Curated annotation (Swiss-Prot):
Pfam families: Gliadin. This is Avenin-like b7. Residues 1-18 form the signal peptide. Contains disulfide bonds. It comes from the Eukaryota. Belongs to the prolamin family. It comes from Triticum aestivum (Wheat). Seed storage protein. Might be integrated via inter-chain disulfide bonds within the glutenin polymer. One of its GO terms (molecular function) is nutrient reservoir activity. Keywords: Disulfide bond, Seed storage protein, Signal, Storage protein.
Amino acid sequence: MKVFILALLALAATTAIAQLETTCSQGFGQSQQQQQPGQRQLLEQMKPCAAFLQQKCSPLRMPFLQTQVEQLSSCQIVQYQCCQQLAQIPERTRCHAIHIVVEAIIQQQSQQQWQEPQQQAQHKSMRMLLENLSLMCNIYVPVQCQQQQQLGQQQQQQLQEQLTPCTTFLQQQCSPVTVPFPQIPVDQPTSCQNVQHQCCRQLSQIPEQFRCQAIHNVAEAIRQQQPQQQWQGMYQPQQPAQLESIRMSLQALRSMCSIYIPVQCPAPTTYNIPLVATYTGGAC
């Protein structure tokens, strides 16, 4: 019986996807003709996401399954396929892929029923769906694509100054703060905790698309500095161990700051960064 139910589910899902892909193909026909071959391939790959973003899905009618399993909707199936496709696309090209899809949808709808006020509302709705994709798929989907330009040396230096707390935290150059009171009501903060808070605050003020460049500039500065200091005269195997420690600290920052920090930067990256006031204080 279970095999029979699963077979019916698979059949219904396949039928729904086939119908959605037909609709997608018809809707994106003109857009695909105007795209480059690489973009056309991405559009083809992202059909489930296009169908989901356009909400071209409906409940699957399977009344005989109501008492056995929860009825799936074609949206749920398409969402799953969309997430599966996104996960297979490298992170650095994910933004480009999803925005090709959105642009195709917007161009199609602009040629159809949307007048100016309705079009703006539709664009806002599309943006919200895009942001929700990150949560639904549990993967990073940028809202804005990075432009392929290099940061200047002065901007990199400004970023490093701005992220001095992160440098201090990653190097673990902090120690317990002596607070004789109150020992029982609250835990004594450490200078590491203070610096971590400052680091997270500075990172949150940097636009999301520039955080990777910023945090990796810091890590690179630490890497270049350390061989000239404590690693001189020591065995080389200790240096990779230190770099691994920095990488682990970088990953820890993602959860501690509750903000997105890529572990690997797409290359090349980005453009002029709106910098906030740089950090000039001490550890506390």
